[in-house]
Amino acid sequence: MRVLGVEGTAWCASAALYDADAAADSVVIESDAYQPDSGGIHPREAAEHMREAIPAVIETVLGAADGDIDAVAFSRGPGLGPCLRIVGSAARALAQALDVPLVGVNHMVAHLEIGRHQSGFQQPVCLNASGANAHVLAYRNGRYRVLGETMDTGVGNAIDKFTRHVGWQHPGGPKVETHARDGEYTALPYVVKGMDFSFSGIMSAAKDAVDDGVPVADVCRGLEETMFAMLTEVAERALALTGRDELVLGGGVGQNDRLRGMLEAMCAARGASFHAPEPRFLRDNAGMIAVLGAKMAAAGATIPVADSAINSQFRPDEVSVTWRDPESPARDPGADAVRQGAEATVTFADDAVIKERAPKAYRHDRLDDRLRRDRTVLEARLTSDARRQGVPTPLVRDVDVPAATITLQHVGDADLRDALSPARVRAVGRHLATIHDGGFVHGDPTTRNVRVGAERTFLIDFGLGYYTDAVEDYAMDCHVFEQSLVGTAADADALVAAFEDAYEEAAASGRVLDQLRAVEGRGRYQDDPETA
């Protein structure tokens, strides 16, 4: 099968030809990237570039074809509406002229699938790090589920906003990478909430640091060390939550050597496999559109021209995945004497649990020391405070702050992830409402951080928690728990409803669930889509 792919979601006009029947992967890519005269991407100028460049790159690729085209695939979204409309129109016209099926591809799923295709991985977690996006995906029940994502700006856009502030031309990522090699680490805000992250505060702090006279190279080093450590930590949390041992990287920011090195080091430390496609498949390109288009066409996932409207807000979890096998069971570490979590090694001894936050080789030493120390102290305090509020938690038996080690009572028989029930989920709703009324959050209440026994449901691992009276923070706690249900449970909708019912009954304020709706709408591409 030969598939012609067309890509043009934002700034890169690209066409590609993929021959699925070739002895070795054969992908011919022709791209023409838009380069603004100054500042960032202007939607109107980008669309004008697409209008001129798309016909040219398609013509070049068609000239390289040595046989008939069997299908046309195009990036249906997400992206800039004016650019997507040009790409969609070109793809429809081409499919009709060639009298072949049309395939509408989700741009972000294509970033994931090109890594899965090239690596041969079966059940990977995917970290997508691109201009407008940053999210972690895993396959579950016929869809790629969003386990975590940016709650404001994309990682690449945050970098570009910083570089525009210092007067550098788009794209900013390569310039930050170059300057960071000569810089010293500068501390910047580190914001991870469960498996979600925020980059707007880091970007603002980086601008302020430059304005205050900190050398630009030092700020660039701080940006890389902070932002990429956040991405790597969340990817590791996703591996731990799902029990998977394969990670693929997608998106243009993935071309950064430091980010790839961090992810590779993290995976090596936990015995997981890692794959990053070659750079031409990481940045926006039609090759990944053609490869996924071939898989979708072979599975019959084509669309009539009349139903092929673009969707500028096309989320990856909206795509029905029909082209791959069902998921295989994840490895169950429950019986292991030593368990490797996302940020700590847990050793079981009699009725005790010894939790050690060992140094993370992928993080800068100063950042790593700060996170390990602060999280150890907070976990001990908040675990005890929650217990005083009446929430079942382990007894804290010993804390060694310099060694970042806590000894706790061993509680429960299983993680909630492996023993889900409406009653236990309702208990989590009551527990979170109680600690929120007490003035603090858990910070990472996933189904791996809840232990269950015959009669009680325990909250554990408060290392990302903190004291706060902000309704927004309480809503984020609820959001993190619900995301973990969606990523691991077959009947997630019913369990989410049970959780929210119990939370609403127990909480002193009714504002948290209202704010939760606002938080859910803040993820990438949640607004009404632009279609045409």
UniProtKB/Swiss-Prot annotation:
Active site: 444
Keyword set, alphabetical order: Acyltransferase, ATP-binding, Cytoplasm, Iron, Kinase, Metal-binding, Multifunctional enzyme, Nucleotide-binding, Serine/threonine-protein kinase, Transferase, tRNA processing
Binding positions for ATP per the UniProt entry: 338-346, 355
EC numbers on record: 2.3.1.234, 2.7.11.1
Residues bound to Fe cation: 107, 111, 284
Entry's Gene Ontology molecular function annotations: ATP binding; iron ion binding; metalloendopeptidase activity; N(6)-L-threonylcarbamoyladenine synthase activity; protein serine kinase activity; protein serine/threonine kinase activity; protein serine/threonine/tyrosine kinase activity; zinc ion binding
UniProt keyword Nucleotide-binding present: yes
Main localization (coarse): cytoplasm
GO biological process, one term: tRNA threonylcarbamoyladenosine modification
InterPro entries reported in the protein's UniProt record: Aminoglycoside_PTrfase, ATPase_NBD, Bud32, Gcp-like_dom, KAE1/TsaD, Kae1_archaea_euk, Kinase-like_dom_sf, Peptidase_M22_CS
Disulfide bonds: none
Ranges for domain Protein kinase: 329-532
Compartment(s) where it occurs, according to its Swiss-Prot or TrEMBL record: Cytoplasm
Gene3D superfamilies attached to this UniProt entry: 3.30.420.40, Phosphorylase Kinase, domain 1, Transferase(Phosphotransferase) domain 1
Enzyme kind, highest EC tier: transferase
Highest taxon above the source species: Archaea
HAMAP family cross-referenced by the UniProt entry: Kae1, Kae1_Bud32_arch
Record text on subunit structure and interactions: Component of the KEOPS complex that consists of Kae1, Bud32, Cgi121 and Pcc1; the whole complex dimerizes.
Family the UniProt entry places it in: In the N-terminal section; belongs to the KAE1 / TsaD family. In the C-terminal section; belongs to the protein kinase superfamily. Tyr protein kinase family. BUD32 subfamily.
Biological role: Required for the formation of a threonylcarbamoyl group on adenosine at position 37 (t(6)A37) in tRNAs that read codons beginning with adenine. Is a component of the KEOPS complex that is probably involved in the transfer of the threonylcarbamoyl moiety of threonylcarbamoyl-AMP (TC-AMP) to the N6 group of A37. The Kae1 domain likely plays a direct catalytic role in this reaction. The Bud32 domain probably displays kinase activity that regulates Kae1 function.
NCBIfam families assigned to the protein according to its UniProt record, in alphabetical order: arch_bud32, arch_KAE1, gcp_kae1, PRK09605.1, PRK14879.1-3
Protein name per the record: Probable bifunctional tRNA threonylcarbamoyladenosine biosynthesis protein
Origin species: Halobacterium salinarum (strain ATCC 700922 / JCM 11081 / NRC-1) (Halobacterium halobium)
Phylogenetic classification of the source organism: Archaea, Methanobacteriati, Methanobacteriota, Stenosarchaea group, Halobacteria
